[in-house]
Curated annotation (Swiss-Prot):
Disordered: annotated span: 210-242
GO BP annotation list: tRNA N1-guanine methylation
Gene3D superfamilies cross-referenced by the UniProt entry: 3.40.1280.10, tRNA(m1g37)methyltransferase, domain 2
Domain of life: Bacteria
Annotated Gene Ontology cellular component terms: cytosol
EC number(s) per entry: 2.1.1.228
Matches recorded under SUPFAM superfamilies: alpha/beta knot (SSF75217)
Family, as annotated: Belongs to the RNA methyltransferase TrmD family.
Protein's UniProt name: tRNA (guanine-N(1)-)-methyltransferase
Known function: Specifically methylates guanosine-37 in various tRNAs.
InterPro entries for the chain: Alpha/beta_knot_MTases, tRNA_m1G_MeTrfase_C_sf, tRNA_m1G_MeTrfase_TrmD, tRNA_m1G_MTases_N, tRNA_MeTrfase_TRMD/TRM10
Name of one Pfam family that matches: tRNA_m1G_MT
């Protein structure tokens, strides 16, 4: 089976070097489950100074990423199976777990376009199938959002995480936050582990965890709780917990 291919168009390819060395994501790359390929627009610049930015038409602060080197870098990327092109921009839709699951399941290749400088030429948007943001804030470039997406997608690929069950139970997998976790010791500085978790009653443990997920989501993220209730129906809460 061919590895899941991740192509990144970036002016800072060195920023991605640690991804191949750390934790389960690095092991996934070494095991051939995923492949990371970096493309620097500077390698496609047409002048001897490898210039990739210019002043904005109409004036204004900062420099704008030119379209020619970005398009040239993009055109050099082969299409490998079911490809999706994502543009990293604070104007994009906020990244959700459902996006990561969709990209990991429905596609074999992601192309991640990282902006830089004050912004990018508007024509670069035409390359993208989707525009993605980490939230309502601005970073110096699209590299950190791209790394976030790479991490989130690769960990969902079969074999990356040892237990598939852990992917099902974690926060946002079905719209709810994850339940609390405890390990030894049973008592620490006056704080104890809930008795139900030490009871050995798997049914009671499952019910407790689901109750904790719902309570925690309602308290910390009422927006998620509202969406979850609309999806499953408040009348079906007890059935969903069973």
């Amino acid at each position: 089976m061919a590895p899941y291919r991740l192509d990144v168009v970036t002016l800072a390819p060195q920023a991605f070097a640690p991804m191949g060395e750390l934790g389960v994501i690095g092991r996934a790359f070494h095991a051939g489950r995923a492949e990371l390929v970096l493309h620097n627009p500077r390698d496609h610049a047409s002048d001897r100074y490898r210039k990739v930015d210019d002043e904005p038409y109409g004036g204004g602060a900062g420099m704008v990423l030119k379209p020619e080197p970005v398009f040239a870098a993009f055109d050099a990327i082969p299409v490998c199976g079911r490809r999706r092109v994502l543009l990293m921009t604070p104007q994009g839709h906020p990244l959700q777990q459902a996006d990561l699951q969709r990209w990991a399941t429905d596609h074999d290749q992601l192309v991640l376009l990282c902006g830089h400088y004050e912004g990018f030429d508007e024509r670069i948007r035409t390359l993208a199938d989707e525009e993605v943001s980490l939230g309502d804030f601005v970073l110096t470039g699209g590299e950190l959002p791209a790394m976030t997406i790479i991490n989130g997608v690769v960990r969902l690929l079969p074999g990356t995480v040892g237990s598939a069950e852990s992917l099902v139970e974690e926060s946002h997998s079905d719209g709810l936050l994850e339940h609390p976790h405890y390990t030894r010791p049973a008592e620490f500085r006056g704080m104890g582990v809930p008795e139900v978790l030490r009871s050995g009653d798997h049914g009671a443990i499952a019910r407790w965890r689901q109750e904790q997920r719902e309570q925690r989501t309602a308290a910390r993220r009422p927006d998620l709780m509202q969406r979850w209730q609309q999806r499953f129906g408040a009348d079906n809460d007890s059935e969903h917990r069973a």
